[in-house]
Amino acid sequence: MAAPVDLELKKAFTELQAKVIDTQQKVKLADVQIEQLNRTKKHAHLTDTEIMTLVDETNMYEGVGRMFILQSKEAIHNQLLEKQKIAEEKIKELEQKKSYLERSVKEAEDNIREMLMARRAQ
């Protein structure tokens, strides 16, 4: 009877190891994405701060692909605020995803510990 238990534990450990490796990769990817979104948010904030120092009637050019479009200061300001808001929302989503992944790995580890304790009690 010891052999089936060992096979079952071995299978559980290999599944856990695969899950941990996969989760670590996903967490690293989420960290990179969060870092990039923080840079985007900071860049938009700094640009907006500089724009707000200009006179209200100032027209500006927005780079779109290989051309520039003439827009008002207010339109550019609104676009930058929207960009910051979207970045913040995506950061929150990624943080939630990251915490979920970490929780799921911890639960899998706890399940294996529980299985080991049950086997030792027998």
From Swiss-Prot:
N-acetylalanine found at: A2
GO-annotated cellular components: cytoplasm; cytosol; prefoldin complex
Zinc among keywords: no
GO BP field: protein folding
Keywords: Acetylation, Chaperone
UniProt family annotation: Belongs to the prefoldin subunit beta family.
Job description of the protein: Binds specifically to cytosolic chaperonin (c-CPN) and transfers target proteins to it. Binds to nascent polypeptide chain and promotes folding in an environment in which there are many competing pathways for nonnative proteins.
Protein name: Prefoldin subunit 1
Gene behind the chain: PFDN1
